[in-house]
Amino acid sequence: FEDAKKVRFFKSNSETIK
């Protein structure tokens, strides 16, 4: 499951957009 990196990036992006 190499989606951990994507999830981290997505979470970071979400926080930035907030």
Curated annotation (Swiss-Prot):
Keywords: Ribonucleoprotein, Ribosomal protein, RNA-binding, rRNA-binding. It comes from the Bacteria. Coiled coil: none annotated. One of its GO terms (molecular function) is rRNA binding. One of its GO terms (cellular component) is ribonucleoprotein complex. The keyword Transferase does not apply. The keyword ATP-binding does not apply. One of two assembly initiator proteins, it binds directly to the 5'-end of the 23S rRNA, where it nucleates assembly of the 50S subunit. One of the proteins that surrounds the polypeptide exit tunnel on the outside of the subunit. Part of the 50S ribosomal subunit. Belongs to the universal ribosomal protein uL24 family. This is Large ribosomal subunit protein uL24.
